Amino acid sequence: MQWNQVLATRNARMKASEIRELLKLLDQPDIISFAGGIPDPALFPTEAFREAFNQTLSGDKAGAALQYSVSEGYRPLRDWIVAEMAKIGIPCTADNILITSGSQQALVYLAKLMISPNGTVLVGWPTYLGALGAFNAYE
């Protein structure tokens, strides 16, 4: 079967992620990478993460912590963000807040929302390679 006949035309513009190629370099033991947005694992607050994990999975709400949730994000976190925004004079509601799993997901959502067919996107130079990949996928 000729898969090109059934795939969306945007697939012709898609290519391997530059970030994925950069990450392959990290497998080399003599490389100290300053690219790719990879933080030093020694800086991770692992003990704080462990305590938060244990607290979250204790008690009667443990099952809810592992369950699927609304796509907008965890409502108590969105409510907390609303309160924090109000403290600095920015009015909003939880419906104005969208929690993403990271910058890449946010960029893909923005690209879906903002890029029209044959539209133009301006970026600075140098720019985040992940943004180019997210934007390039849309007409």
Identify the meaning behind each predicted range.
Residues M1-S71:
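N-terminal "arm"/small-domain region of PLP-dependent enzymes with the aminotransferase-like
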Residues L57-S58, G63-E139:
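Conserved core of the PLP fold type I
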